[in-house]
Amino acid sequence: MKYFDIGGVEVSRLGFGCMRFPVIDGDNGKINKKESEKLLLDAIERGLNYIDTAYPYHEETSEDFVGDFLQKHNLCDKVQLATKLPCWLVEKEEDFERLLNIQLEKLQTDYIDFYLLHSLDVKRFRKIVDLGVLDFCKKIKEKGIVKHIGFSFHDEYPVFEEIFNANDWDFCQIQLNYLDIDYQAGMKGYELATKNNVPVIIMEPLKGGRLSNPPEEIREMSKKFEPLSYSQVALKFPLSLPNVMTVLSGMNSHKQVEENCEMAGSVEYNSLTDEEKEFYKVSRQAYKDRERIGCTACEYCMPCTVEINIPKVFSLWNKAFLYDEEEKSKKDYKEYLKDGISPEECIECGKCEDICPQHLEIIKGLKDAHEYLK
């Protein structure tokens, strides 16, 4: 295992994401504790020391499980523990401390190594700033309750810049993989953090497992990298970035632990070959060629006059072709239609097309998407 130094603290370059543990009978709120313990111990024995959990994971049971696990195996002082403030639950200033105390109790600790403001977007961030979150962050760090303060991010790049510049962060966490270099914060966000010497944590390096099971044309191109698996080829992209502190992976099998730890122990910074860079570039184009409409989910088109969730409809349409998920996309579309407005309700007012920064034919796209997904 290779490590990243942040203020004298050695962090493993692979982190264990505690959101996708094995569960019992398909119930996400019932972690299979025996199997999950084995996976964590396997990873720790291979040198992993960064454990990433959060308040809502596994229907609010992940923190409890992690706390029990660390106590049972006497690992509290041997790992770097990360959890996140559930910002969406904050309604008043007192909630910051109340929620943190609940988390400390769940994790059975009196301090947290890495504490993040969870899943920030522009509305959420501005709301908690108005409630005093930045002063709260400063206070808990000064008291030693939290060693490092950061944030995880889910919005467009300009919002990332706003949040990044609002505070003296110790680190930040963004979604990045070889496919999503322009998605959300993307490579621009990584480069901004790097320029300012703020370490970056990477989430979704395999895009929720989709890059582990790529389309046939990408499988064919990947053969040149054998014996590396598709997952390992994908992991090499974020692991090679020199300002990446750790790459998170929600591992639920020993094979995943073994493969991912192997990569985190072998990939050097700035080590991508021209051939690998070309593979990532060609793969991105292969995915783009499968895309049905170039929606970036910026939501400029929202709210729709008749309240159709335009980005949601286009996302399901694209996913069916991007990841060979026709059946799943059609099932998810049926679920959406239970409460959501059907594209059939479109009155063709054209407001969405007037404001779309991608200049998409949204009206036609909605008709085509509905025709395919219904």
Predicted regions and their residues:
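A general structural detector for well-ordered alpha-helical segments in enzyme core domains, enriched
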Residues: 2, 35-39, 62-70, 99-103, ...
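Structured C-terminal cap/extension of enzyme domains
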Residues: 37, 44, 48-49, 188-374
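Glycine/proline-rich, positively charged
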Residues: 24, 88-206, 214-219, 225-226, ...
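Structural motif corresponding to the early beta-alpha repeats
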Residues: 57, 73-93, 118
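N-terminal binding-site loop/beta-alpha segment at the start of enzyme catalytic domains
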Residues: 1-79, 142
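Structural motif
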Residues: 42, 46, 106-107, 167, ...
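Conserved residues at the C-terminal ends of beta-strands
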Residues: 17, 54-57, 115-118, 152, ...
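Structural preference for beta-strand elements that scaffold enzyme active sites
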Residues: 3, 11-15, 49-50, 78-84, ...
